Amino acid sequence: MAAKIKRGDTVVVISGREKGKRGEVERVLPRENRVVVKGVNTRTRHARPSQQNPDGLYRFDAPIHISNVMLVDPNTGEPTRVGYRFTESGQKVRVAKRSGKDIDG
C-alpha cells in the first residue's frame, strides 16, 4: 500500500486510545504500514539510572498503524482523505479530497 502520508505532515488520530490528538509525523515505516507521530503513543522504558539519565526512564513515541491517522488539510485545518493528480508539467502532487486543493506546493 502506498503511504500517502509523508514525514513532516500534520495528522490527527482517528481511532484508538489517542483518538483526537494531532501531531507531526516524525517517521514513516512503509513496510510495516506504520507512522511515528510526535507526542502520540508515548511509551516508557526502564533502564539502569546513569549520570546522563538519573531517573532511569526512557520515553519515546511508538509507531501506530497508518490506517489510524488521517492527514490534516493545510488549507482548512480539517482531517481529509488524500488523492493524487498530475500537474500540467507532469508532476504528481497530493490533493486533499475534502477541499480539492493541492497539499504539496
From Swiss-Prot:
Molecular function as annotated in GO: rRNA binding; structural constituent of ribosome
One Pfam family, short name: KOW
SMART domains reported in the protein's UniProt record: KOW
GO terms classed as biological process: translation
Keywords, comma-separated and alphabetical: Ribonucleoprotein, Ribosomal protein, RNA-binding, rRNA-binding
Keyword RNA-binding: yes
Matches recorded under Gene3D superfamilies: 2.30.30.30
SUPFAM superfamilies, alphabetized: Translation proteins SH3-like domain
InterPro entries the UniProt entry points to: KOW (IPR005824), Rib_uL2_dom2 (IPR014722), Ribosomal_uL24 (IPR003256), Ribosomal_uL24_CS (IPR005825), Ribosomal_uL24_KOW (IPR041988), Translation_prot_SH3-like_sf (IPR008991)
Keyword flag Metal-binding: no
Similarity section: Belongs to the universal ribosomal protein uL24 family.
HAMAP family: Ribosomal_uL24_B (MF_01326_B)
Function: One of two assembly initiator proteins, it binds directly to the 5'-end of the 23S rRNA, where it nucleates assembly of the 50S subunit. One of the proteins that surrounds the polypeptide exit tunnel on the outside of the subunit.
Record text on subunit structure and interactions: Part of the 50S ribosomal subunit.
The protein's name: Large ribosomal subunit protein uL24
Organism lineage string: Bacteria, Bacillati, Actinomycetota, Rubrobacteria, Rubrobacterales
